[in-house]
Regions:
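Catalytic-loop of the protein kinase fold
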Residues: 287-294
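Short amphipathic alpha-helical recognition elements used for nucleic-acid or partner binding
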Residues: 328-331
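Conserved phosphoryl-transfer catalytic core
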Residues: 339-341
């Protein structure tokens, strides 16, 4: 089944000048709206000004997201990354609008994809494959096609990077910096600059498909013999820096009706596997797949003999964390698990979340918020609300209202004056942890996360 003509594009705009001009135009238009707004807002009451300011910010944010979406390529990927991590340096209206940048975007026409395949693999290798011209999925940086190796019928998945995407990353980052600066949308310049340096390096890594092939093989090696997980096999013969070919691994999305209808025991099995994978990355591997997107996972239902399994699909965003971050962060998790507040704060200060000379009530308020974040992984649930536990005393991930409770406690703690900009590594780690929580919550699981964590703390 092919996509409608209006959902397919012939080429990606990759020229430095045309992409830079599109971003500059968007920034100029967005910035000019501020001048118009200031004039019309001059005589408004304070309440009206606040309402008008929020309305303007929302309109400007939606316009910016719309313009970024038109360019596809790394601009869209950068926007999606800002949606995940922008809470540290952008207004909420901006991150909300950026969440509308759909990952499953318009596909590139087969002729352009075929040209890319020929350039990267050559006609001789392509002759060994039958490739479905209709993609399984289209994203911001490339699209995925199903294929078959002719000689033995091996089912394959081929990820093809869009032409010119890798070359446009740096110019796209510079254009977005210009856009946000002209639009006056950055709330924390220091956080913005720190995140952008890290994000730029991460995106360059993500478009190196040979690195992703290595990451995939590393994960497969680390999970050898663990029947809870399926890692696709890499086919190096049909891979390059811009092409990644793996075994085709079918499965259901976690939100599929069949998954939701599984028994609690089976859903718990999958949820524990998801949490255990993250904890293995954190405590054993030292390398973490930082992208929390649900699209990176599939569920393969068992047949009675084989258990239900998680299919792990994307290792492009694997990140190796330095020991000077990992060790204190692990210690923070351990201290929060055991409710050892002094040890927790000692490591938080080591990571410069807090400072030792801050008022004691500020330090304790920070510890309160952190203990609540780690609540599902606690050694015991003495301080957990009754509604978050089932009759067996097991944690009800979907019913815990944890995000709402954490947000409320954080706002009441008045930490903004003291809370330092976290290390850049924390931005990625925190988002991954929240992604794992969300995955487990979506499965409607009921189990004590501390039981999964404790084996890593011995």
């Amino acid at each position: 089944m092919t996509s409608p003509p209006d959902k397919r594009i012939k080429r990606i705009k990759t020229g430095f000048f045309e992409r830079r001009m599109e971003m500059a135009k968007a920034g100029f238009i967005s910035g000019s709206k501020i001048l118009t707004h200031s004039a019309t807002n001059f005589w408004a009451s304070p309440e009206e000004k606040e309402r008008n300011n929020k309305k303007l910010m929302s309109e400007r944010a939606q316009y910016m997201a719309s313009e970024m979406g038109k360019l596809k390529g790394s601009v869209v990927k950068i926007g999606q990354m800002m949606a995940l991590y922008g809470e540290y340096f952008l207004p909420k209206e901006i991150t909300d609008a950026l969440h509308t940048l759909e990952e499953n975007t318009a596909e590139l026409e087969w002729s352009a994809i075929e040209t890319q395949l020929l350039q990267e693999l050559g006609a001789h290798k392509l002759a060994k494959l039958e490739i479905d011209e209709t993609p399984l999925a289209a994203a911001s940086l490339g699209q995925v096609h199903r294929a078959r190796r002719i000689e033995d019928g091996q089912e394959l998945c081929i990820k093809v990077q869009y032409p010119g995407v890798a070359k446009s990353i740096d110019s796209d980052f510079n254009a977005i910096i210009q856009l946000l600066t002209l639009s006056q949308m950055i709330t924390s310049k220091r956080a913005f600059e720190q995140w952008f340096r890290e994000a730029r390096a991460m995106l360059h890594q993500e478009v190196d498909y040979l690195q992703e092939a290595h990451n995939t093989e590393f994960a497969a090696q680390m999970l050898t013999g663990d029947l809870r997980y399926i890692v696709p096999q890499v086919f190096r013969e049909f891979s390059s820096k811009k092409i990644l070919t793996t075994s085709y691994e079918p499965g259901l999305v976690v939100t599929a009706a069949k998954v939701k209808k599984l028994s609690l025991r089976r859903r718990n099995h999958l949820a524990k596997a998801s949490l255990d994978l993250f904890l293995s990355e954190l405590f054993a591997w030292g390398e973490i797949q930082t992208d929390p997107n649900f699209g990176n996972y599939r569920v393969r239902l068992g047949d009675g003999k084989q258990p239900d399994q998680l299919v792990l699909l994307d290792f492009g965003a694997m990140k190796k964390f330095p020991p000077n971050f990992l060790n204190p962060f692990r210690n923070m998790i351990s201290a929060a698990h055991h409710n050892r507040r002094d040890a927790f704060l000692e490591n938080a200060i080591a990571l410069e979340f807090m400072r030792a000379d801050y008022p004691e009530d500020v330090l304790q308020n920070f510890a309160d918020v952190a203990m609540e974040i780690i609540e599902p992984l606690a050694a015991n649930y003495h301080n957990v609300p009754d509604f978050a536990l089932n009759p067996k005393g097991e944690y009800r991930w979907a019913e815990s209202k944890l995000p709402r409770r954490v947000a409320k406690k954080a706002s009441q703690a008045s930490l903004s004056k003291y809370f330092a900009l976290p290390p850049k590594e924390f931005m990625f780690m925190n988002r991954k942890l929240m992604g794992v929580y969300s995955f487990v919550k979506t499965l409607g699981a009921e189990f004590n996360g501390g039981e999964v964590l404790k084996k890593y703390l011995s």
